[in-house]
């Protein structure tokens, strides 16, 4: 994959960057994705891994590619977009359905980004940057003040996931 000047949602490098990201994803998959784990346990493990190995990039998204999965997984520093992209990459690696979601203009923070993940047959909100784990859409809207365009996204449960 060649990087193009001004391209969105890409990592500013070529094979080296992609191979580093793939190595992180593969390490995460091989170390933490045990045979027979439930969707819940796989998502929880990926979530805990990201929360334990990445800090919020207060300097801004432009440092250490903090708005990319690479910034979160390789540099260990990200903003919400980097956390959400890293969570998507980890879920892809461990075989869990995951969507990347961006707040709309009516949200308390219109630039915020997070994920929707499927655990069993239920879709829930997951925000590794802020600490939201398997929340229902009602909780996410009420407590975090988030709203988003749901077109093209699976319908989330209204209530939080209970194991």
Indicate residue ranges for each PLM-predicted region.
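Long, amphipathic alpha-helical segments that form or neighbor coiled-coils/leucine zippers used
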Residues: 6-10
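Secondary-structure boundary elements
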Residues: 13-72
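Active-site nucleophilic cysteine motif
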Residues: 42-46, 76-91
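A glycine-rich, coil/turn loop motif that links secondary-structure elements
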Residues: 63, 72-76, 105-108
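Hydrophobic/aromatic-rich core segments of domains that either
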Residues: 82-147
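Short, low-complexity, Pro/Ser/Thr/Gly-rich segments in the mature regions of secreted, periplasmic
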Residues: 148-162
